[in-house]
A protein has these predicted regions:
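Intrinsically disordered, low-complexity N-terminal regions enriched in serine/proline/glycine
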Residues: 3-5, 31, 78, 126
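Short, small-residue-biased leader/transition segments that mark boundaries at the very start
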Residues: 1-13
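Positively charged
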Residues: 19-35, 98-102
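Compositionally biased amphipathic helical and low-complexity segments enriched in hydrophobic
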Residues: 6, 39-41, 157
Length: 190
């Protein structure tokens, strides 16, 4: 039936949006991993050899952006509901000024510096190492692999600003923005 073919992308999008909601960790680790297991809790799993089973700062920031897109497309507030939990999680894993100095890192205004991965259950930073034979993960920030950063700058302020903007929209403004978002998505797909 041709109607099924036309509804397939919509069903697939709906499945993806539901999956993003389901994969978010519970408080206080309300983030996302690079990969999740298919266990009862969709817990973080190992991805590539050097990507440990842990919550990931960049995946968390990107999923927040996706949830805000889903809200723009659907108008369903369930996509905004747990974003503040993710913001709290990112704040909880951020490096303070002394830690950034120790790591020799700095960030731009509005950004925070976070470990790329944190341990499930503890939020301890996980650092990536290798020798010619294998990769390993531990808590020591010395002697890190050079082809994959163990820290990430997250523009948390811009995420918070976008979130507040979406909350502040009137129904009329929201309708106009939703139509614009759909038109932009359609034109970029061409």
């Amino acid at each position: 039936d041709h109607r099924d073919l036309h509804s397939f992308p919509t069903r697939r999008s709906s499945d993806l949006m539901t999956c993003v909601l389901a994969l978010q960790g519970g408080k206080p680790q309300a983030g996302w991993a690079m990969q999740h297991k298919l266990d009862l809790n969709y817990s973080p799993g190992h991805a590539r050899d050097f990507e440990p089973a842990g919550y990931a700062a960049t995946a968390t920031a990107e999923m927040c952006r996706n949830l805000m897109r889903f809200y723009r497309w659907t108008g369903d507030t369930k996509y905004l509901a747990r974003i503040p939990d993710a913001f709290e999680f990112l704040e909880s894993i951020r490096y303070n000024d002394a830690q950034m100095k120790q790591l020799g890192k700095s960030v731009k205004p509005g950004q925070i510096l976070c470990p790329t991965f944190v341990e499930v259950g503890t939020n301890r930073p996980l650092y990536l190492h290798n020798d010619p034979d294998h990769y390993w993960v531990d808590y020591d920030y010395h002697g890190l692999i050079t082809h994959y950063s163990s820290t990430r700058a997250i523009d948390l302020q811009s995420l918070k600003d976008e979130y507040q903007h979406l909350l502040s929209l009137s129904k009329e403004d929201f309708s106009a923005e939703t139509a614009l978002a759909i038109a932009q998505a359609a034109s970029s797909a061409l």
